[in-house]
Amino acid sequence: MATLSLHSHSFLLVLLPFILILRQNLAVAGGCQVPPVIFNFGDSNSDTGGLVAGLGYSIGLPNGRSFFQRSTGRLSDGRLVIDFLCQSLNTSLLNPYLDSLVGSKFQNGANFAIVGSSTLPRYVPFALNIQLMQFLHFKSRALELASISDPLKEMMIGESGFRNALYMIDIGQNDIADSFSKGLSYSRVVKLIPNVISEIKSAIKILYDEGGRKFWVHNTGPLGCLPQKLSMVHSKGFDKHGCLATYNAAAKLFNEGLDHMCRDLRTELKEANIVYVDIYAIKYDLIANSNNYGFEKPLMACCGYGGPPYNYNVNITCGNGGSKSCDEGSRFISWDGIHYTETANAIVAMKVLSMQHSTPPTPFHFFCGG
């Protein structure tokens, strides 16, 4: 017992500086006098309950155990990066667009992200193109209701709200990861990347034509470091930190293309503010320097089945019968083999808010409403 207490004390000493920095960033950015409107498009990295609302899919405890003390449809033990970013702007956590039970709680925007989403094929739920069409319907309906009923005007987002909103895009991971899972070779996966980039570019241009001017684009993380991938791929092609080199190489190529796309769009869309965020660098740093952050076994899931080295079994995933979760998720980077723990998400958010990984460097409170 004494050993456990000492270990916990040491861990808190390691983590405390990051918690304090995050709180400081939240306080500075949280000075928004007018909370912003935010629209998010993405996959499970930023899904705040869309899959549950849209398909009735059950995501139960232990998901959500550390912050919400209940399952919210998020694939984590607590908050996601997008939740911390919303809190930094002093706005409510985003509700899923498909959640019909939240009443008028779309005044600060909506979240179109859904678990498993990709950019291609375009018309398969819930691809980026489908999410975009949902947004266009949402906008049309909101403006219609605001125009015909005075009582509803206070609850609806108006033209200025859509024009000044922040449009966040975090998608592409599944396009790459699923291609590998289907048995495609590295060269074939790489050939798909330009098409994925093209879909994201098209979405931004459509949003721009609809009046959007503020865009926040996340690249994809180190796919080769996910316990899920590591447990399912029999390969000797590991990098020095134990990650799958080919998966990470493909992710880097995708990120390079996404960066170039953002640079091109800044030239093409003269009035747009487009911020590119290097999530890959942030997340890989957590893996490479896990001890500095107080994490144990950086390539092992907290919740899953099978034990070391990865604690992931595709037939017994987190939350399903037979799976087990660790006592302290704060000591793990990976929650369920694919998604991050709240502690890891908090550190990622802190580093995002630092502007050190953003191009161009932009304080997040730039997106305050007004």
UniProtKB/Swiss-Prot annotation:
Short name of one Pfam family: Lipase_GDSL
CDD domains for the chain: SGNH_plant_lipase_like
One MF annotation (Gene Ontology) recorded for this entry: hydrolase activity, acting on ester bonds
Key words of the record: Glycoprotein, Hydrolase, Lipid degradation, Lipid metabolism, Secreted, Signal
Positions glycosylated per UniProt: 90, 315
UniProt xrefs under SUPFAM superfamilies: SGNH hydrolase
Enzyme Commission identifier(s): 3.1.1.-
EC class name: hydrolase
Cellular compartment(s): Secreted
Main location: secreted
GO cellular component, one term: extracellular region
Signal peptide location: 1-27
Gene3D superfamilies: SGNH hydrolase
Active-site residue list: 44 (nucleophile), 336, 339
GO biological process, one term: lipid catabolic process
Residues annotated as transmembrane: none
UniProt cross-references to PANTHER family, sorted A to Z: OS01G0331100 PROTEIN, ZINC FINGER FYVE DOMAIN CONTAINING PROTEIN
Family in the record: Belongs to the 'GDSL' lipolytic enzyme family.
Protein name (database record): GDSL esterase/lipase At1g09390
Species: Arabidopsis thaliana (Mouse-ear cress)
